[in-house]
Amino acid sequence: MAFKTTSVATTTSASTKPTVDFDALNDFVVEQVGCQQPETLNGVIVGIIDLGNQKLPDAEYDVDSGDEDLSVEELEAKYADEIEAGKISKFDFVKDWSTRPPKDVIKKFVPQKDRQCISYCVDFPDVMLDKGQFFGENSEPKPLRLYFGGQYYHQGLKKMIVQNLLPLKLSNIAKDPRNDKLWSLNPKSQLHKMAVASKIINTGEAFLPDQIDELLGKTLQFKVQIGFNEKGDKKYYFEKMSFLGAIQRKDKPFENVDVFLIQMDDENDPEALKQIRKHLLNTMEMATNFEGSALQKQLLEVRPQSFGGTSSSAVVKKETPKAVVEPVASDSNEDDDDWS
């Protein structure tokens, strides 16, 4: 997909923002969308956001064959050298929900390398919302926009961050992996499934991380739910979205949509940067390659208020973006689809 190249002059300042009644805004969205129960909607991928190289949680595995009857202490003693070398993080109990009743089982936890991760956002043009009234802006209905990955409050950081990251991990998908190499995002990964559903590739073909921008503008089916979780006398707004598959034959793809690609080390569209939600910015800040990146510099110019700073006017030139990734080969731990 070709991106337009334009020059954009952007003036920003630490001006006072309008006070937003988020309770009223959330009530409005829930009522207007009408998806308190999960519903299938056609949506178009309009944005891909590079979250940088993120530290991932330990991978969880079954204990090795022959170790099933050992206790945690016995496993720690047997693999003391591997634990000291950092090849194994720990052995610990986890709840096995596949049994009835659920039972505690011992799992092996192994460190994962930092990996480049992304998120993406989807517009649903069949659901138009006019949020201007809540932000002191002119009336301008826009499609419902949802971001993959959900969000949660990180107690240590004291801020909201992305809950489910999409790591760009490669697997050897050759039919004879011992003798041949065919590197690709894992066929079980969400991004590979999207590529097949949107007919970018056929089943069994490779889909590489530097191809993910080809998903921009593609119309697919998603499961959507927007509502409130009630706890005591309080209610908490939530948005859920997960990829389902290709659209039905009778449906037409959405056309003439504006798309954007945000990357860590490229010039990005200032207008797109202004629209990124705060939990995505918070997650970008956690990336090991965020400090000193081109993206950090641009965000400090375009959105200084999001980082506690100020900025004078800045002129940013948009260039044609290309998906630039640093994939790490892996034969395991594919990212599964999350109902996030």
Question: What does each model-identified segment do?
Answer:
Residues A2-S340:
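Short beta-rich binding modules
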